[in-house]
């Protein structure tokens, strides 16, 4: 996330393109306003149809006397598509399918996913064939190939999550899952652009333009699917016609019986499946060796105990490595240490000392370190794209880009995080609770920005939330200007609440991605009930998208319960958490 070379900033927007976009946006707002009545009618009719169907099924085989709701498939599709950012591509891509002659909103959503999957599946063949002429560009293209595969998995998972029961609407839990996975799929595609865009070569600039053009359809189609699930299925799920009945007590519905028993047994870290020790007193001397035992796509928890020591190795748990728990003897005793960095030729995405994609990852009492140093610029200690991942009593030590909360739902509790520029960044739905966040002295003439949030689509359910934490200097030599963060993308979302902010903070609080360029009005940056000498908001930035205070009701939207659905899965990770304010 280099200040100058990064492609990611909103400041890179062409002025003419921005004017055209604003004109298009105004036109779309008018269209949406007009079509809202139609859309509401479609939704009411869809729910009415479901209710009629259910009542009819429960009464008698004959339904001749029950009035049926008649809808125009074309009108339904148009109303649905008018809620998306790209209504034209939504309508044209779905209406071309034979199955589109329907008014079922869930089927229309699945068709939108189908066109997104078809488009993304063909994308790898469109990647630049001569990338091998530039070694760094080839590494960036490799990142693209990896994240496209992840995005496809998210799209397929979204189809599976809604089930196959006809005439019923998805449950709110299913909708939340799908919103998360589609948000991640969009983030994956954006990560490709980031990897190529951070390079500063002629070949990279040409490749970036080529890839952006080739990705336009896949990005729009995925965005359309996300808008439909957020604005249509999300509303329908509030009616009492769920496709899967949600459990209100006990373990969350996504856990199987075997997984529940294992979690009950292993919550106390008493029965590890593997023990790692540098001195040879365990089964393995390296973490990597122990992780080779993990079965792919296993619903069973696999736990690894890592004894005190510094383990110099890079770990990458792929998307098919599920439900791994790794724990040590303490965040200041057991460390995983690496030194990969951007300056030596590694894409930021691949610099992580420890990277995890597979769902259900848990880390406890362990530290993650990237010791490349400030002069090496981007150097990630930990990157997580693991859905429902938990980090409890962990430490993350680095300089620029220390902690990459890339995508999906994540929770950090009682953790220590040090760094300089953008040292908590990414586009996950992530909550940091009761953590110690410690900016450190950067290179001369540099500044510190704690966060850089990467939300690029308004319907993504993502953001960085820091709650009940402390923000204090690391060491006693911090003199560099220090800020709570800077907006990385057009819809960046960051909330600092109920935290203690030290005197280290510059009174303006936040800074723009591009100096002297105000962020888009579409960002959401807010503070709520903070304390300490740095919590005074009287001199804060005056951006349209910044809120120096928000209501209790607004703040509730960013709690563990509302933002990451924590009560459904955190109790089984044996981690403390506050679900509300």
Curated annotation (Swiss-Prot):
The record marks 400 as: Transition state stabilizer. GO terms for molecular function: enzyme inhibitor activity; pectinesterase activity. Disulfide bonds join 415-435. SUPFAM superfamilies: Pectin lyase-like (SSF51126), Plant invertase/pectin methylesterase inhibitor (SSF101148). It catalyses: [(1->4)-alpha-D-galacturonosyl methyl ester](n) + n H2O = [(1->4)-alpha-D-galacturonosyl](n) + n methanol + n H(+). The keyword ATP-binding does not apply. One of its GO terms (biological process) is pectin catabolic process. Pathway: Glycan metabolism; pectin degradation; 2-dehydro-3-deoxy-D-gluconate from pectin: step 1/5. Its EC number is 3.1.1.11. Pfam families: Pectinesterase (PF01095), PMEI (PF04043). One of its GO terms (cellular component) is extracellular region. Glycans are attached at residues 101, 156, 200, 217, 268, 477. It is an enzyme of class 3 (hydrolase). It is found in: Secreted, Cell wall. InterPro entries: Invertase/methylesterase_inhib, Pectin_lyas_fold, Pectin_lyase_fold/virulence, Pectinesterase_Asp_AS, Pectinesterase_cat, Pectinesterase_inhib_dom, Pectinesterase_Tyr_AS. Residues 1-55 form the signal peptide. Keywords: Aspartyl esterase, Cell wall, Cell wall biogenesis/degradation, Disulfide bond, Glycoprotein, Hydrolase, Secreted, Signal. It comes from the Eukaryota. SMART domains: PMEI. Coiled coil: none annotated. The PMEI region may act as an autoinhibitory domain and prevent untimely PME activity during transport. In the N-terminal section; belongs to the PMEI family. In the C-terminal section; belongs to the pectinesterase family. May have roles in the deposition of pectin in developing tissues and in the wall loosening and cell separation that occurs in cell expansion, fruit ripening and abscission. PANTHER family: PECTINESTERASE. This is Pectinesterase 3.
């Amino acid at each position: 996330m280099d200040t100058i070379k990064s492609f990611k900033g909103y400041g890179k927007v062409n002025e003419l393109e921005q004017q055209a976009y604003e004109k298009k946006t105004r036109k779309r707002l008018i269209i949406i306003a007009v079509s809202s009545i139609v859309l509401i009618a479609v939704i009411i009719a869809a729910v009415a149809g479901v209710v009629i169907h259910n009542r009819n099924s429960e009464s008698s085989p004959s339904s001749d006397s029950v009035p049926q709701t008649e809808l125009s498939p074309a009108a339904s599709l148009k109303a649905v598509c008018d809620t998306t950012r790209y209504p034209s591509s939504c309508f044209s891509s779905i209406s071309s399918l034979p199955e589109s002659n329907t008014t079922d909103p869930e089927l229309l959503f699945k068709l939108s996913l189908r066109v997104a999957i078809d488009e993304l599946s063909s994308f790898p063949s469109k990647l630049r064939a001569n990338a091998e002429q530039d070694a760094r560009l080839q590494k960036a293209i490799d990142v693209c190939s990896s994240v496209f595969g992840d995005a496809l998995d998210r799209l397929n998972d979204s189809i599976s999550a809604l089930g196959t029961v006809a005439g019923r609407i998805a449950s709110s839990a299913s909708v939340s899952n799908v919103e998360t996975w589609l948000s991640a799929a969009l983030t994956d595609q954006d990560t490709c652009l980031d990897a190529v865009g951070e390079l500063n070569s002629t070949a990279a600039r040409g490749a970036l333009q080529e890839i952006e053009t080739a990705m336009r359809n896949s990005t729009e189609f995925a965005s359309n699917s996300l808008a439909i699930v957020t604005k249509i299925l999300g509303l329908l799920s509030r009616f009492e016609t769920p496709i899967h009945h949600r459990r209100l007590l006990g373990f969350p519905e996504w856990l199987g019986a075997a997984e529940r028993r294992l979690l009950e047994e292993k919550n106390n870290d008493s029965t590890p499946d593997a023990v790692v020790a540098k001195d040879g007193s365990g089964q393995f001397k390296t973490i990597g060796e122990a992780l080779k035992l993990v079965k792919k796509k296993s619903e069973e928890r696999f736990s690894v105990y890592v004894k005190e020591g510094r383990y110099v190795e890079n770990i990458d748990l792929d998307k098919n490595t599920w439900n791994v728990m790794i724990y040590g003897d303490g965040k200041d005793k057991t460390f995983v240490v690496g030194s990969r960095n951007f300056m030596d030729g590694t894409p930021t995405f691949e610099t992580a000392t420890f990277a995890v994609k597979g769902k259900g990852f848990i880390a406890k009492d362990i530290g993650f370190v990237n010791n490349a140093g400030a002069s090496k610029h981007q150097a990630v200690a930990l990157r997580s794209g693991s859905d429902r991942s938990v980090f409890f009593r962990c430490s993350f030590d680095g300089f620029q880009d220390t902690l990459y909360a890339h995508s999906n739902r994540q929770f950090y509790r009682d953790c220590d995080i040090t760094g300089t520029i953008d040292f908590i960044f990414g586009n996950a739905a992530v909550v940091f609770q009761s953590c110690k966040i410690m900016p450190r002295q950067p290179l001369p003439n540099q500044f510190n920005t704690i966060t850089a949030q990467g939300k690029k689509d308004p319907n993504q359910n993502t953001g960085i939330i820091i709650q009940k934490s402390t923000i204090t200097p690391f060491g006693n030599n911090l003199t560099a200007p220090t800020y709570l963060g800077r907006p990385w993308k057009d819809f960046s979302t960051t909330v600092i609440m109920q935290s203690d902010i030290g005197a280290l903070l510059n009174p303006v609080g936040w800074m723009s991605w591009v100096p002297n360029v105000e962020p888009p009005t579409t960002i959401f940056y807010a503070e709520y009930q903070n304390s300490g000498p740095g919590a005074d908001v009287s001199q804060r930035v005056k951006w349209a998208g910044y809120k120096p205070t928000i209501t209790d009701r607004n703040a509730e939207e960013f709690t563990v319960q509302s933002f990451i659905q924590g009560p459904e899965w955190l109790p089984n990770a044996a981690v403390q958490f506050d679900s509300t304010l």
